[in-house]
Design a protein with these regions (language model features):
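N-terminal strand-loop-strand
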Residues: 2-44, 94
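Short, charged/polar surface micro-motifs in flexible loops or helix N-caps
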Residues: 19-22, 32-35, 51-52, 87-89, ...
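Residue-level detector of high-confidence beta-strand sites
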Residues: 28, 80-82
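The catalytic Nudix box helix
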Residues: 44-80, 134
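Hydrophobic pocket-lining residues within nucleotide cofactor-binding pockets
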Residues: 50, 72, 100, 105, ...
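Active-site-adjacent beta-strand/loop module that shapes the phosphate/pyrophosphate-binding cleft
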Residues: 82-119, 131, 153, 160
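Non-DNA-binding regulatory cores of transcription-related proteins
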Residues: 122-128
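Charged phosphate-binding loop/patch that engages nucleotide di/tri-phosphates or the phosphate backbone
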Residues: 135-161
Length: 161
């Protein structure tokens, strides 16, 4: 695995289900005041950064749990490969079939100075919400660089039939 210049690599899980004869995927919306009014093109698969010498699938599972509050069962994963985001960050993803109540998802938190230069430190959720989307909806919501994961998921499911 090669990383960007800063060595940043993320690993994540694209959870999917069939609902009402349609394929749906679970996407996450980043938390914090800088993301409040951002929607189309600003959602992501639940993912997080890899620390040195960590096993990538373990990172993907851990980050999924941290960002959704949901422990992924020991279910088979389908490798979706990697993409590179505009920032240069490398993102690796796996797909898992599963279901969860998106309304009960709870993310871990982070702290930052807010408002900027105020001297006040506030706590924000890393992910402020997760939602299920059809593939067509997800293509509009997801960061453009991550859309190929949807195509790869669709191809993997079709090949498995």
């Amino acid at each position: 695995v090669t990383t960007d210049k800063s060595g940043r690599t993320s690993a994540g899980i694209l959870l999917w289900r069939h609902r009402n004869h349609r394929l749906e995927v679970l996407l996450a919306h980043q938390g914090g005041p800088q993301w409040v009014n951002k929607d189309l093109g600003h959602w992501t698969i639940p993912k997080g950064e890899v620390e040195q010498a960590e096993e990538l699938v373990a990172v993907a599972r851990r980050e999924f749990a941290e960002e959704t509050g949901y422990q992924l069962p020991d279910t088979p994963l389908v490798e979706l490969g990697e993409i590179r985001q505009k920032s240069g960050k490398l993102v690796l993803a796996w797909a898992a079939r599963g279901d969860l109540d998106a309304t009960t998802a709870v993310s871990n938190t982070y702290q930052m100075e807010w408002p900027p230069r105020s001297g006040r430190v506030e706590t924000f959720p890393e992910i402020d919400r997760v939602e299920w989307f059809t593939l067509n909806q997800a293509r509009r919501k997801l960061k453009a660089a991550q859309v190929p994961f949807l195509d790869r998921l669709q191809a993997a499911i079709a090949a498995d039939r």
